[in-house]
Amino acid sequence: MLKIADVEFESRLFTGTGKFSNSQVMIEAIMASKSQLVTVAMKRIDFKMGLDDLLTPLRQAGVRLLPNTSGARNAKEAVFAAELAREMLGTHWIKLEIHPDPKYLMPDAIETLEAARILCEKGFIVLPYVHADPVLCRRLEEVGCAAVMPLASPIGSNQGLVTESFLKIIIEQARVPVVIDAGIGAPSQAARAMELGADAVLVNTAIASSASPIVMAECFKEAVQCGRRAFEAGLGRVQTGAVQTSPLTGFLNQ
């Protein structure tokens, strides 16, 4: 069981809501994934319409919403988006995203740390999206973040665990859950992330852009489960040379 702040999750697969062809496909894919935490961009919600086509089906599905501050260019804008989410959605959970560069969507470490400090002081449960930077992740822990969400590779790129070496360090040192976010493009990559010891993964583009999002969501669900079980079972040690599984020495000496 995964615990973030005071909430327990049976599923270690978190999902997003972007890039789906329509809301029905989105909901069916989320249900197939068994995800219990779903991120939604504040910039996509039309609060003037009340419960719009995005929020209504998500609430009916009974999943926990994790609003994100995607689109924020600095700490001030991110804090404003988080406070709006708390007021309009009734949640103090926030996925903190600050990426001023619209081309590569790289997170701004300085602004993210500042926003995280402010939001934690205001009582938010903060899950920051950041570079796979072990030092930064430790600093975010220290200011009170409930989890850290280091990227595997650029958002939506499907490149996989490009930052694996740094993710290993973050996982080793972390005292809060590590959710690997961004760039996971295949179930095998999600399984690998879990084998490393990640507490969860967040997947959106790989599911939403699939020719069959519902089937792909099921594949990711199973991959995450298998990867976690493999980690808990204990993977064999990687060797530089060959090691016989059935030595023949005794047989030859008879």
UniProtKB/Swiss-Prot annotation:
EC nos: 2.8.1.10
Query: Catalyzes what?
Result: [ThiS sulfur-carrier protein]-C-terminal-Gly-aminoethanethioate + 2-iminoacetate + 1-deoxy-D-xylulose 5-phosphate = [ThiS sulfur-carrier protein]-C-terminal Gly-Gly + 2-[(2R,5Z)-2-carboxy-4-methylthiazol-5(2H)-ylidene]ethyl phosphate + 2 H2O + H(+)
Q: Name one GO molecular function term.
A: thiazole synthase activity
Q: Any keyword Phosphoprotein?
A: no
- InterPro entries associated with the record: Aldolase_TIM, Thiazole_synthase_ThiG, ThiG
The annotated pathway is: Cofactor biosynthesis; thiamine diphosphate biosynthesis
Q: Name one GO cellular component term.
A: cytoplasm
Which CDD domains does the record cross-reference, listed alphabetically?
ThiG
Q: Where does 1-deoxy-D-xylulose 5-phosphate bind?
A: 156, 182-183, 204-205
State the Pfam families in the record: ThiG
- Keywords in UniProt for this one? Cytoplasm, Schiff base, Thiamine biosynthesis, Transferase
GO BP term, pick one: thiamine diphosphate biosynthetic process
What family does this belong to? Answer: Belongs to the ThiG family.
Functional summary from the UniProt entry: Catalyzes the rearrangement of 1-deoxy-D-xylulose 5-phosphate (DXP) to produce the thiazole phosphate moiety of thiamine. Sulfur is provided by the thiocarboxylate moiety of the carrier protein ThiS. In vitro, sulfur can be provided by H(2)S.
Q: What is this protein called?
A: Thiazole synthase
